């Protein structure tokens, strides 16, 4: 039997919103402005959700957990990621891995990278790597207006039992 992998890219971005708690890569960042959104606006977790759902042909974050579904209002990115992974598995796929990059000036991901990877990997039930980059002052994240998350996910059809 030939295993055919499926790969997809997911993107998410949110503007900073003063007064909201900051959740990025499954972690709370005290003292940082949070991000505006229907849920906790965790760009890393949301990008990973988009990548996983797309790889399994299950749509995207908005189609699965959007504003038309009030039960997901205020949900944590980790909860959305865990539910996305469950849906991917229910659709007959095994998750190989996910890689997420957070683009922006703050918070500084590096010092908490291992913690973020542990939290997101537990939510997915597969390895999740986390990295970060700045844009040297260019664009939305470079102007410190918010953050962008980009993720890639690898899934493959689960072997028949």
Swiss-Prot record:
The keyword Lyase applies. SUPFAM superfamilies: IpsF-like. Its cofactor is a divalent metal cation. Homotrimer. Pathway: Isoprenoid biosynthesis; isopentenyl diphosphate biosynthesis via DXP pathway; isopentenyl diphosphate from 1-deoxy-D-xylulose 5-phosphate: step 4/6. It comes from Salinispora tropica (strain ATCC BAA-916 / DSM 44818 / JCM 13857 / NBRC 105044 / CNB-440). Binds 1 divalent metal cation per subunit. It is an enzyme of class 4 (lyase). It catalyses: 4-CDP-2-C-methyl-D-erythritol 2-phosphate = 2-C-methyl-D-erythritol 2,4-cyclic diphosphate + CMP. InterPro entries: MECDP_synthase (IPR003526), MECDP_synthase_CS (IPR020555), MECDP_synthase_sf (IPR036571). Involved in the biosynthesis of isopentenyl diphosphate (IPP) and dimethylallyl diphosphate (DMAPP), two major building blocks of isoprenoid compounds. Catalyzes the conversion of 4-diphosphocytidyl-2-C-methyl-D-erythritol 2-phosphate (CDP-ME2P) to 2-C-methyl-D-erythritol 2,4-cyclodiphosphate (ME-CPP) with a corresponding release of cytidine 5-monophosphate (CMP). The record marks 38, 134 as: Transition state stabilizer. This is 2-C-methyl-D-erythritol 2,4-cyclodiphosphate synthase. GO terms for molecular function: 2-C-methyl-D-erythritol 2,4-cyclodiphosphate synthase activity; metal ion binding. Belongs to the IspF family. PROSITE patterns: ISPF. A divalent metal cation binds at residues 12, 14, 46. GO terms for biological process: isopentenyl diphosphate biosynthetic process, methylerythritol 4-phosphate pathway; terpenoid biosynthetic process.
């Amino acid at each position: 039997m030939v295993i055919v992998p499926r790969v997809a890219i997911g993107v998410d971005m949110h503007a900073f919103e003063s007064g909201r708690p900051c959740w990025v890569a499954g972690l709370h960042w005290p003292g940082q402005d949070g991000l505006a959104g229907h849920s906790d606006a965790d760009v890393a977790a949301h990008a990973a959700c988009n990548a996983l759902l797309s790889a399994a042909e299950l749509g995207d974050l908005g189609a699965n957990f959007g504003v038309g579904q009030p039960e997901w209002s205020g949900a944590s990115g980790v909860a959305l990621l865990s539910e996305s992974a469950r849906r991917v598995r229910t659709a007959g796929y095994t998750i190989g891995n996910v890689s997420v990059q957070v683009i922006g000036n703050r918070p500084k991901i590096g010092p908490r990278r291992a913690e973020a990877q542990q939290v997101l990997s537990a939510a997915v039930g597969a390895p999740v790597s986390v990295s970060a980059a700045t844009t040297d002052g260019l664009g939305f994240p470079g102007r410190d207006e918010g953050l962008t998350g980009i993720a890639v996910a690898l899934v493959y059809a689960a072997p028949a039992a």
